[in-house]
Regions:
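Conserved PLP-enzyme active-site core in the AAT-like
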Residues: 16-39, 43-281
Length: 281
């Protein structure tokens, strides 16, 4: 009897607990599960999964970019983007607390053979002036600076967001120095909702964008990498090399499409809840 009461008490406590470890600790809604149950599927490695094709086309159109590819994780989309943009012995410029540097298992070195130039930013954000100062001169003794990567929102910056004017200035620096510009947009929709921006605002400024379908949006798994057609064609090859080619993946792709179509605006509710918690603490 004592054991049963202890089990009941533990179950009750768990039912009253809110898990704040991550915005990925979610469960699909009944409506999302219904979409998953009825998802049309095919072989995505052969480009024949209609649900994945719909997701990729929808996302590319949303951002005003030419093409997109679905991957299992944001780490994979980031690493594929870096691999596509660089050659071994080149250099990637990013903020010191960036996810691509802190949380992707040394993937830049392992997958792309590149070194990293770290910038000490302000809550995860860097400026055009800092990027300019970080670019290596054309010197055979130096690694060639090839790619700048931004993160918006910045995870270890406490969810800080870039202003569009600041991104435009960084874009100009990249153009002037022939560098590509990648966006780790795992939580980009939080920034879009908070700042009342549009996805196409970002699509016009970056060579590649990675977005996550689970962080804040409630899909069980998956990320999308966006870019030009030739870039995404190359990305599909690296996705296969990294083990990211899936077969009947429309089951999870359908959940991701549902999340994009129904769950973005409700991020404003999350933001209000976060403000209430911050004020209470």
């Amino acid at each position: 009897m004592v054991f049963k009461r202890a089990v009941w008490a533990l179950q009750y406590i768990r039912s009253m607990t809110i898990d704040f470890r991550s915005d990925t600790v979610t469960r699909p809604s009944p409506a999302m599960m219904e979409v998953v149950k009825n998802a049309r599927v095919g072989d995505d490695v052969f480009g024949e999964d209609p649900s994945i094709n719909d997701l990729e086309a929808f996302t590319a159109d949303m951002f005003g970019m030419e093409s997109a590819v679905f991957c299992p994780s944001g780490t994979m989309t980031n690493q594929i983007a870096i691999k596509c943009h660089t050659q071994p012995a080149e250099e990637v410029i990013c903020e010191r607390q960036s996810h691509i540097y802190q949380y992707e298992g040394g993937g830049i070195a392992y997958n792309s053979g590149c070194q990293v130039k770290l910038i000490e930013g302000n809550r995860g954000r860097i400026t055009a002036e800092q990027v300019t100062a970080a670019i290596n001169p054309d010197d055979i003794h130096k690694a060639k600076s090839t790619l700048v990567s931004l993160e918006n929102t910045a995870n270890r910056g406490g969810g800080s967001c870039y202003e569009m004017d600041d991104i435009r200035k960084i874009r100009k620096v990249c153009d002037d120095n022939r560098l590509n510009l990648h966006l780790d947009g795992a939580r980009l929709f939080n920034a879009i909702v908070a700042k009342k921006q549009q996805p196409k605002d970002f699509g016009s400024l970056f060579d590649s964008i990675s977005i996550c379908l689970s962080k804040g949006l409630g899909a069980p798994v998956g990320s999308v990498l966006l870019g030009k057609k030739d870039f995404i064609k190359k990305a599909r090859r690296f996705r296969k090399v990294m083990g990211g080619g899936m077969r009947q993946s429309g089951i999870i792709g359908a959940a991701g499409l549902y999340a994009l179509q129904h769950n973005i605006d409700r991020l404003a509710i999350d933001h209000e809840h976060a403000r209430q918690i911050a004020e209470a603490l």
